[in-house]
C-alpha cells in the first residue's frame, strides 16, 4: 500500500512539473494571452478598461400598484436565485416593479455581460445612419474597411454584417490557449484576427453568429464617424440614458481597440434603461435617441434566421436548442415556446439577458453567474403570465 501511495505521489508531482513546463512554454509564446486567461479564471477583467461617461440617468418610476402577481415574482426570484443571479429587475407598464440584488451584490455591481454589447452596437450603427455618417445598411462595408476593397469581401454590406450573414470566416471556439479564438477574446491585437478573416461563403447564404461581424462593424463605425468608439457611445447614447459610467475593454495600450463583440461592462439598471429605449421605439422622455424606423429594422426577422434581427435575438419561432452557428456545438436551451410572440432579447454568455416584450410593456434584466444550462423561456414566461 505504501509503495502504491509513493508511486501515485510521484505521478502527481510529475504531472504538476509537466503542466508547469507547458504553462511556461505557452507564456513564452504569448505572455499576454496566457496571463489574461489566468485573469479570466480568477474572475478579473482580461484587458484595459476605458470609461464610457454617463451624464444623465433616465428616471424610472417605482410601481405604486401591483401589475404582476406576487406568485410570478416569487417564482422568478426562486429561479434567479437557483441559477446564481446577481440582479433581477422587472419593468412593467412604465414602472419598476422589482429591483432585486442577491446577497453579495448591489446596485453598483458590474457583471460582465459579454455579447449583450452586440445589441448596443446595433443601436449605434442606426444613430450613425441617422446622422449621415453612413448612407444606409445596404452600403458596402468596404467603403469604410478598405482592407476588403479588392477581394471577395467587397461584396459584403453593412446589413449582412448586422444580420450575421456576411459569409466571413470566423474562428471556432477552442481550449487551445494560443488559438485564434483566444487571441480574439483576450489577445493584444484583436483586429489582427477579426479584420483579416477571409470570405468563406457568399453573403446571404448562411446565418453564422460570431464575433467577427460586430468587431468589424465597430471598426467601421469608428472610421465612419471619426470618433473613438467609447466617445461616440458616450456622446450619442450613454449620456442620455445611463446612471453610471460603463466600460469597454481595450485589447492593449498600444492598439487601444475596444472589443465591440463583447465586453461593455455596466450596472444592471442601465441595461434596463437600454431595454426601455427599445421598448419605446428609440425614445426616452422627449428625446428620440435613435429613429423609430431603425428600431423596427433591429427587431425585424432576418431572411436566414427569423429569430435574429440586427445583432439582436427574437422569439419568432420556437427552437428547443437554439443554434448559434454551424461550427459550434453550443446551443441555448428553451424549455418551451415563449408565451408572447414578440419577445426581443440581448443574449450574453451564460445567461446574461435583457428581455423586452412590447405587447406586455415589459422589460426584464438578469445578470449573474455563468449558467450553461440557462433556460431562455423560464423568466419571460413566468413573469409575462403573471402580468395583471
Cite the ranges covered by each PLM segment.
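Active-site helix/loop module of the DD-peptidase/beta-lactamase fold
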Residues: 131-169, 196, 225-262, 266
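Short, small/polar residue-rich loop motifs at catalytic or cofactor-binding pockets
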Residues: 82-85, 109, 349-351
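Active-site-proximal alpha-helical segments within enzyme catalytic domains
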Residues: 213-220, 260-284, 352-367
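N-terminal leader/targeting segments and the immediately adjacent pre-domain N-terminus
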Residues: 2-105, 130-134, 382-388
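Active-site Gly/Thr loop motif
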Residues: 244-245, 301-363
